[in-house]
């Protein structure tokens, strides 16, 4: 059974109670940590406390479950008018190629805080073709700059 969950802003149920499908406690935060560790080189070794902060400060959070296992995740931030950013979109390697990534991205883009935003940004290392299938376009007139602490 597939469940696509549109969490409330800040994902309180997932953060504090580990809730998954049907509001059942599933140790969801630990499962999210494992999903990221196993499937996203850029998100390995995130601590539970950092994930809680990350979720608390996210505007839109979507998770995809097969039974009681989380197999997909994505989140977004937006000012609701001019700019938004999609973050941490990941699908478990055993579930790729099933359309789950598109489900998550489309759910994020339809969210109230995102749907009327003029420009939605995302960064990808090796999934440019995937995102181009969902109408994201490469921009060569801008450069990505990073300030790291």
Regions found by a protein language model. Give the residues of each.
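Conserved acetyl-CoA pyrophosphate-binding loop and the N-cap/start of the following alpha-helix
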Residues: 95-104
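A conserved beta-strand-loop-helix scaffold within acyl/acetyltransferase catalytic domains
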Residues: 50-90
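Conserved active-site alpha-helix within GNAT-family acetyltransferase domains
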Residues: 114-149
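Short alpha-helical functional segments enriched in proximate histidine and acidic residues
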Residues: 111
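Short amphipathic alpha-helix that is part of the acyltransferase structural core
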Residues: 1-48, 142
């Amino acid at each position: 059974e597939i469940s696509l969950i549109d969490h409330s802003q800040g994902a309180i149920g997932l953060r504090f109670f580990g809730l998954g499908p049907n509001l059942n406690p599933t140790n969801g935060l630990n499962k999210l940590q494992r999903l990221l560790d196993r499937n996203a080189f850029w998100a390995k070794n995130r601590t539970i406390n950092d994930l809680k902060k990350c979720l608390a400060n996210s505007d839109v959070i979507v998770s995809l479950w097969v039974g009681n296992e989380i197999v997909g995740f994505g989140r977004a931030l937006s000012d609701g008018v001019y700019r938004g950013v999609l973050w941490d979109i990941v699908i478990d390697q055993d579930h790729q190629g099933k359309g789950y990534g598109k489900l998550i991205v489309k759910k994020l883009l339809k969210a109230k805080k995102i749907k009327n935003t003029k420009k939605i940004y995302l960064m990808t290392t090796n999934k440019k073709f995937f995102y181009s299938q969902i109408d994201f376009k490469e921009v060569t007139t801008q450069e990505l700059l990073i300030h790291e602490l």
